[in-house]
Amino acid sequence: MKKYEIYLPLNYSDGQPIESEKITRVREELLAVFGSFAEPYRRAWKYDGAKYIEILKIEIITTGNKVIKKRLKEFKERLKESLQQIDILITTHGIQVI
């Protein structure tokens, strides 16, 4: 099993907020493709005097097969385009179910 963490920006690169409808579409697609997800927290930080509260972490637990990895890579490319981002951080961690 694998846990994938998607760090979803809530603002465009110019600092303007991403429309809530786009974030809703992301959630709907994740639910349709993977069957479930969790949103455990938001991330905030300061940089060069500016305050940022703009990252929503979404977790998905699923098999770690190649099909899932391919779908996530395709999903990431769509996110980068629709949210106008240079990159979207997606990490993976092996998990063991007890």
Predicted regions: what they are:
Residues 1-98:
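Positively charged, small/polar-rich N-terminal and surface patches that mediate targeting and assembly
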